[in-house]
Swiss-Prot record:
Organism lineage: Bacteria, Bacillati, Cyanobacteriota, Cyanophyceae, Synechococcales
Organism (species): Synechocystis sp. (strain ATCC 27184 / PCC 6803 / Kazusa)
Name of protein: Small ribosomal subunit protein bS18
GO BP term, pick one: translation
Transmembrane stretches, start-end: none
Signal sequence range: none
Chain segments annotated as coiled-coil in the UniProt record: none
Any one Gene Ontology cellular component term annotated for this protein: cytosolic small ribosomal subunit
């Protein structure tokens, strides 16, 4: 009999996701610069929305690249 394990979020529930924290944001984007989906990151829905907003804001102020051209 299989029992489903509760998936734990990789971030604490109270931890804010800041657009200036590029080390944290880089954990959730691919080598090409795409944002990883929620099923891979394991974040909650609210954390994923906040992460997406933070990554997009970080790209606009040039802390993260839009596309990583290194192949």
């Amino acid at each position: 009999m299989n029992y489903y394990r509760k998936r734990l979020s990789p971030l604490p529930p109270n931890q804010p996701i800041d657009y200036k924290d590029t080390e944290l944001l880089r954990k959730f984007i691919t080598e090409r610069g795409k944002i990883l989906p929620r099923r891979i990151t394991g974040l909650t829905a609210k954390q994923q929305r906040d992460l997406t907003t933070a990554v997009k804001r970080s790209r606009l102020v040039a802390l993260l690249p839009f596309v990583n051209k290194e192949i």
